[in-house]
Amino acid sequence: MKRQKRDMYARAFKRGYLAGVSGKSKDSCPIEQAEVRQEWLNGWREGRTDQWEGMTGVSGIHKLANVTTA
């Protein structure tokens, strides 16, 4: 549990990625700290790119495993 709390940037990236893959707007970012918000947006951009390339559902499972371990 403590390890998750220490790495806020990786968690923000992961949550942003998941929001992007699910098609949510970047305006739905819940983070207010500038550095952490930027990581969320980076994850969101990568997630949106994967969504546009069709990496959702079963075809995106291999990519999702790499994102969620961070």
Swiss-Prot record:
It is found in: Cytoplasm. Pfam families: RMF. The keyword Plastid does not apply. Disulfide bonds: none annotated. InterPro entries: Ribosome_modulation_factor, RMF_sf. Coiled coil: none annotated. GO terms for biological process: regulation of translation. GO terms for cellular component: cytoplasm. Keywords: Cytoplasm, Translation regulation. During stationary phase, converts 70S ribosomes to an inactive dimeric form (100S ribosomes). Belongs to the ribosome modulation factor family. This is Ribosome modulation factor. It comes from Marinobacter adhaerens (strain DSM 23420 / HP15). The gene is rmf.
